[in-house]
Amino acid sequence: MLTITSYFGFLLAALTITPALFISLNKIRLI
């Protein structure tokens, strides 16, 4: 149970961090 919860937490973190990095990279590229 603990591994499943940590896996979903990691997946959620990846889904929130990845778009933020992508947006920041696009902003740097535009400037």
Swiss-Prot record:
* Intrachain disulfide bonds: none
Q: Which Pfam families match?
A: PetL (PF05115)
GO terms of biological process kind? photosynthesis
Domain of life per record: Eukaryota
The record, for InterPro entries, names: Cyt_b6/f_cplx_su6
How is it placed in the membrane, per its record?
Single-pass membrane protein
**A GO term, aspect molecular function:** electron transporter, transferring electrons within cytochrome b6/f complex of photosystem II activity
- Where is this protein chiefly located? plastid
Which positions, given as ranges, span the membrane? 3-23
Q: Which UniProt keywords apply?
A: Chloroplast, Electron transport, Membrane, Photosynthesis, Plastid, Thylakoid, Transmembrane, Transmembrane helix, Transport
Protein localization: Plastid, Chloroplast thylakoid membrane
Query: What are the record's GO terms for cellular component?
Result: chloroplast thylakoid membrane; cytochrome b6f complex
Q: What job does the chain carry out? A: Component of the cytochrome b6-f complex, which mediates electron transfer between photosystem II (PSII) and photosystem I (PSI), cyclic electron flow around PSI, and state transitions. PetL is important for photoautotrophic growth as well as for electron transfer efficiency and stability of the cytochrome b6-f complex.
Q: How does it assemble?
A: The 4 large subunits of the cytochrome b6-f complex are cytochrome b6, subunit IV (17 kDa polypeptide, PetD), cytochrome f and the Rieske protein, while the 4 small subunits are PetG, PetL, PetM and PetN. The complex functions as a dimer.
Stated family: Belongs to the PetL family.
List the protein's name: Cytochrome b6-f complex subunit 6
Q: Which organism is it from?
A: Zea mays
